Amino acid sequence: MPWTIKYTESAQCQLKKLDKSAALRVLDYMDERIGILADPRSAGKNLVGPRMGSYWRYRVGDLRVICDIQDQTVVILVIEIGHRREVYRGR
């Protein structure tokens, strides 16, 4: 069951700020490795805490992709993309 990958406006802006090779790596990873899985939770790690408790993260090198997995609509909504040192701040 293929999943649809969607990006929020802020995630799209963050993707544009990355250099081209890193942005392509993130897009390829999400489409080719995560989107094709029957259960995308098997490749990620769930986040904890009051603000990010329902989100999942995926590692792409030093970058982190924060997602909301919506089972009812079979959609993986990418919330945030950033360096591992900065992506969790402010959430």
Which stretches of residues belong to each language-model region?
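A sequence-composition feature that detects small, non-aromatic residues
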Residues: 11, 22-23, 38, 43
